[in-house]
Amino acid sequence: MNKNFSSMIDRYKHQQLRIGLVSPQQISAWATKILPNGEIVGEVKKPYTFLYKTNKPEKDGLFCERIFGPIKSGICACGNYRVIGDEKEEPKFCEQCGVEFVDSRIRRYRMGCIKLACPVTHVWYLKRLPSYIANILDKPIKELEGLVYCDFYFARPITKKPTFLRLRGLLKYEIQSWKSSIPLFFTTQGFDTFRNREISTGAGAIREQLADLDLKISLENSLLEWKYLGEEERIGNEWEDRKAGRRKGFLVRRMELVKHFIRTNIEPEWMVLSLLPVLPPELRPIIQIDGGKLMSSDINELYRRVIYRNNTLTDLLTTSRSTPGELVMCQEKLVQEAVDTLLDNGIRGQPMRDGHNKVYKSFSDIIEGKEGRFRETLLGKRVDYSGRSVIVVGPSLSLHRCGLPRKIAIELFQPFVIRDLIRQHLASNIGVAKSKIREKEPIIWEILQEVMRGHPVLLNRAPTLHRLGIQAFQPVLVEGHVLCLHPLVCKGFNADFDGDQMAVHVPLSLEAQAEARLLMFSHMNLLSPAIGDPISVPTQDMLIGLYVLTSDNRRDICTNRYTKCNIQTLQTKSSDSSNSKSKNWYKNRPFFCNSYDAIGAYRQKQINLESPLWLRWRLDRRVITSSETPIEVHYESRGTFSEIYGHFLIVRSLKKKILFIYLRTTVGHISLYREIEEAIQGFSRAWSSDT
């Protein structure tokens, strides 16, 4: 990379990019360069691309190797070769063809320029709304368009000099006396002398007015007029009042524009071009397709059109002494229209089309819109190794894991799988490895799991409004076609499971993988970076699930609070529990010795999720409230008795010793308790291993 480009844009030093007007001197500095023999190159003079017979770039053409660099690294147009970066190799360029021995990647950023034979107005600043040229000059856009396209003349304010015409202000070219007589009075050079002395038209007239503009005085005058209109009382005429309001709004916009020019040290006359930059060749390529046919970027054809017309105008101004002035003005208008088409095709009406009636893509078409260079390539990049699918809940996943469908996973990690197949001598080359992947051999999934075990992925949900909109996860293979996600991470993505889609990206570089593991994993982003509140909290589906899980049937409280049968007889230890009476009681008023029996009964559909049941609990007096008195006491024939409370039941012996404690609960409560207990035990194990 050359030093000029490195100083202009350096991704490590510059974190932002500003687009604005540039001076002709800066355009010349970007485009021109001095060869070691002292020759200055950079100006594109010919509208040709490649020579037909040799298939080499035309000298001083749109793909000239002297201007933009060699097509092949270290090889000049003559075919000579030099080692790039070897200081012992002399000379650094070919003395015969003038091509430098540098890397061919220089053709991606080295620019050229076209020296225009007449000034040309930048159509973005003239025709786009708002028209910056019309705003800063405080003139109607129709009047300025008439000047630019040679439909009007502008009489120069000459004083103390004899004039051919005693005229001032704006003159319409369509007046018969001007159109038929004045240009015919002069030859080409004579008409140029007359025009340069007394009248002005074309973009040159606009440039002169912009150059004569004093920005500070314009700002002061606009401010004074705005204050005057603000202090002026309304006259009661609605049309006049609206006109004054529109004028005040225009003055505000004009003052903001002038302040921007002053603040950024930009000269207004830079909106009129005298040098036209030429894009690097790699950004407007010519590609050879099957059959030997060539496909060229539309920009090349638009550049050729500009160069053709500009060269014709140059010939008229320099070689032809007897050319009528009217023909010169017509040619200047054609140059202006060609540059307009290059910058924004169709902005002045019907767009330019090729032989197949297809509209040419101009600069504006390339950079604007959703598929333009900025939104598609620079801002919303479509990257390789990425996929997209609908998200569903993965209840068995850990917080830092996501379920990746096999079809998406094999596409994302295909290069890594191919590499491991070749390393393990399971495939001799890339073609054989791809055939194994297409056939989905069992070994493929084993290697894929090994690759995924050491490679995180990034999940992103648009719009990415904050940094938690993209997080890292450890992928696991799942069946189906959808992404599985832990529900607790949904709040950071502002996602739910009603059809939302997420994009999957694979970090390739070591820096990206390290950042994903150390900073972007979901279990490391539990707090909101904005306010510090927990971000991984139950939402929507989880809240509904927790409510259903912990709800119970309050209507059956009294019937399940006690039983007339002998509790000890009804325990699973008793051999008589298999009789029909015991089975009938177990079905209607269930008692369980442990949580596994309760969940087993639920799975066998003997009880419902919210059905009240009695679960034997460990002898823990913390469940007993000292102030609570039993609702009922049942005495059994063997001397034991049961104390029934609101939410628990105590079985005591004859000596009032606690034999059993039963808690009134549901299968939903039991399931939630077991999940919480497992989570606490897992956290304790992780904490003890870290310490």
From Swiss-Prot:
One of its GO terms (biological process) is DNA-templated transcription. One of its GO terms (molecular function) is DNA binding. Its EC number is 2.7.7.6. It is found in: Plastid. InterPro entries: DNA-dir_RpoC_beta_prime, RNA_pol_asu, RNA_pol_N, RNA_pol_Rpb1_1, RNA_pol_Rpb1_3, RNA_pol_Rpb1_3_sf, RNA_pol_Rpb1_clamp_domain, RNApol_RpoC1. The keyword Plastid applies. It holds the Pfam family RNA_pol_Rpb1_3. The keyword Plastid applies. It catalyses: RNA(n) + a ribonucleoside 5'-triphosphate = RNA(n+1) + diphosphate. SMART domains: RPOLA_N. One of its GO terms (cellular component) is DNA-directed RNA polymerase complex. Gene3D superfamilies: 1.10.40.90, 2.40.40.20, RNA polymerase II, clamp domain, RNA polymerase Rpb1, domain 3. It comes from the Eukaryota. Keywords: DNA-directed RNA polymerase, Nucleotidyltransferase, Plastid, Transcription, Transferase. Belongs to the RNA polymerase beta' chain family. RpoC1 subfamily. DNA-dependent RNA polymerase catalyzes the transcription of DNA into RNA using the four ribonucleoside triphosphates as substrates. In plastids the minimal PEP RNA polymerase catalytic core is composed of four subunits: alpha, beta, beta', and beta''. When a (nuclear-encoded) sigma factor is associated with the core the holoenzyme is formed, which can initiate transcription. This is DNA-directed RNA polymerase subunit beta'.
